[in-house]
Amino acid sequence: MNKISVFKLFLILIVFFTSISCSTNTKKVEYKERSVDEIYNSAMNLLDSKKYKKSSEEFEEVERLHPYSIWATRAQLMSAYVQYKLNDYGASITAANRYIELHPGANDIDYAYYLIALCYYEQINDFRRDQSNTSFALDSFNNLIRRFPGSEYTRDSKLKLGLVKDHLAAREMNVGRTYQDLDNYIAAINRFKIVVDSYSQTSHLPEALARLTELYFMLGLYNEAKVYASVLGHNYPNNKWYIYSYSLFNSKKNNLLSNSKNDKAENIESIDNSDSSIFLKTLDDFIKLFEVEEP
């Protein structure tokens, strides 16, 4: 046998054993036909087991194989929910919006709106960072409350809406304080006014009123200062910001226009609310502090 024949035989043997090996290791995947309710129930069971990825695949299978069934409609909304559980908020919002477009009259359409709001809510950043998602959450919760005032999700939406507004108010207060530190009083006033006008139900209102009172007094605009002092004293007579404002103006009313950093509202934490006997606490006494002769 010549060398060429031996080489050919060797190649034939390699191909033969390779084919045997492949056929042995290859497992035949059998397709098992399932009804639509079987697939949907499988998806729900996986969801209950917190196997969200596999559950998502099963819901997609329902829509792919049975696109015109009632199960497909349900699967579309459940897919949006599963994406929310996977923290894929962008995909969840897209799926929920698609559901709203395809089924605007569905009985559970309010949940799709609620889910969109939740997705934005979960993405809210620290108030010192970009607040785009906070604004989207605000609009989305308001949209749900306006469209579905009797929805079972409205109560929770209102609670979360309050937290969203408080977060946005914190952002405005932070920017306003920064402007005040830089002695840019007009810019600071504009920020604090946003809190008073748009977020009056938040915990930041007393501070905003106190800072507006202080800033207007420092600018010599005593009538404007009186307005905000009146609101502060009437609504928050025992609040530390009222006590701070009174003590500040009572001790510094003749030289508030100095730019001393020690007179700014950052000293609020040093005030003890329990030891307020040193202050005249009536609103009339407070307003009298503003009876400064106009230049």
Where are these regions (language model features)?
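Acidic, polar-rich low-complexity tracts and alpha-helical solenoid repeat scaffolds
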Residues: 2-6, 18-295
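Hydrophobic helical h-region of N-terminal Sec-dependent signal peptides
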Residues: 9-16
